[in-house]
Regions:
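N-terminal alpha-helical scaffolding segments that mark the starts
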Residues: 2, 6-54
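Extended, amphipathic alpha-helical coiled-coil scaffold segments used for oligomerization/tethering
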Residues: 14, 18-28, 52-154
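Charged, alpha-helical coiled-coil and adjacent rod-like segments in eukaryotic scaffold subunits
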Residues: 115-218
Length: 218
């Protein structure tokens, strides 16, 4: 085989790999944004789970407070007992207000994930020349374009569904009158059934996010 032909093929393969690396660098930026959004999601999950837990505790105390409010020998006088119950209901209102605010934060984060997914699709559609095999071809150890894009799509879809579930749970909890039903809602909220931790970890490992330290030493 002529050496010039071998050199040509080698150069073409090398330039193709470099082009793919450049293209994947753009995806790394998208994955970095997704990683940041997911960290804020975890923070919102911790805060809102605690709030819903406080709602459960307040509901558990409410029957005893209402019974005590009708007995002067327990709380001293009837008016004081009523004020205690009213204060507890006011506290519940504040808790649900904060829960709705956390749901708003989940929706904002879901929109961020949607933008990352949409940007990835647009970047792929505008790629010239079009990727081979509809983006399903890998370049060495690098994930394929299709894997990168579909990963972002799956992350957005899972969080979109979980966001809708959280909103519905908070809505139902606000009108729930049975503390056991409320506990079930709380467990469902904590479980985040639409988010598969292992699948999310696999997706986020698909395109490694470059560290700040690595960028500083380039």
């Amino acid at each position: 085989m002529p050496s010039a032909f071998v050199h040509s093929r080698s150069s073409t393969a090398r330039s193709g790999g470099e082009a793919m690396e450049t293209f994947l660098n753009a995806f790394r930026d998208g994955y970095a944004r997704v990683a940041g959004a997911r960290e804020r999601w975890d923070d919102a999950q911790k805060a809102s789970t605690a709030l819903l837990g406080a709602v459960v505790n307040a509901f558990e105390r409410m029957p005893a407070l209402e019974r005590g409010a009708t007995r002067e020998d327990v709380l001293g006088n009837d008016e004081f007992g009523k004020r205690v119950v009213e204060a507890q209901y006011a506290s519940l209102d504040r808790l649900f207000t904060r829960l709705r605010e956390e749901c708003d934060e989940f929706e904002r984060l879901t929109r961020e994930l949607e933008r990352a997914k949409t940007d990835a699709w647009m970047r792929t559609r505008n790629l010239t020349p079009p990727p081979k095999r509809a983006g399903g071809e890998r370049a060495g150890p690098q994930p394929s374009i299709a894997e990168c894009v579909l990963g972002l799509e799956d992350v957005w879809r899972m969080h979109r569904d979980e966001c809708a579930l959280k909103r519905e749970i908070v809505k139902q909890a606000a009108t729930c009158e049975d503390v056991e039903d409320l506990k079930v809602l709380h467990r469902l909220y904590c479980a985040q059934p639409n988010l598969d931790p292992e699948e999310l970890r696999t997706i986020m490992d698909r395109v490694p996010v470059k560290s700040v330290e690595a960028d500083l030493h380039r």
